[in-house]
């Protein structure tokens, strides 16, 4: 099975600029991963969403790169998943584009 979580949007502290360390900004997260499904073994995607949001808000990452590395490790340790693809975007940091990083 493959789970897709698209356009997970919320505000958190992320970035290295002075104003980014004070004011929360919108981030958008997209991810997908595979896992071995059976009737008694499944992944609750609402728990995955909550874990991502709580982690991003708690850790207050300076770099998107650090957030991706941290979340990748956390998700792989928490769940039996394969082929995790993770993308984090900061849609409001620049006026004329959306900045994103992915693994």
Residue ranges of each PLM-predicted region?
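N-terminal, polar/charged subdomain of small-to-medium soluble alpha/beta proteins
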Residues: 1-103
């Amino acid at each position: 099975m493959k789970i897709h979580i698209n356009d997970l949007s919320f505000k958190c502290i992320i970035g290295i600029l002075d104003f980014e360390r004070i004011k929360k900004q919108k981030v958008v997260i997209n991810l997908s991963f595979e896992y071995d499904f059976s009737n008694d073994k499944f992944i609750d995607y609402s728990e995955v969403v909550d874990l991502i949001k709580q982690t991003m808000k708690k850790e207050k990452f300076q770099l998107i790169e650090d957030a991706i590395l941290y979340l990748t490790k956390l998700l792989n340790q928490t769940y039996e998943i394969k082929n995790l693809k993770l993308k984090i975007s900061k849609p409001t940091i620049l006026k004329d584009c959306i900045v994103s990083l992915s693994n």
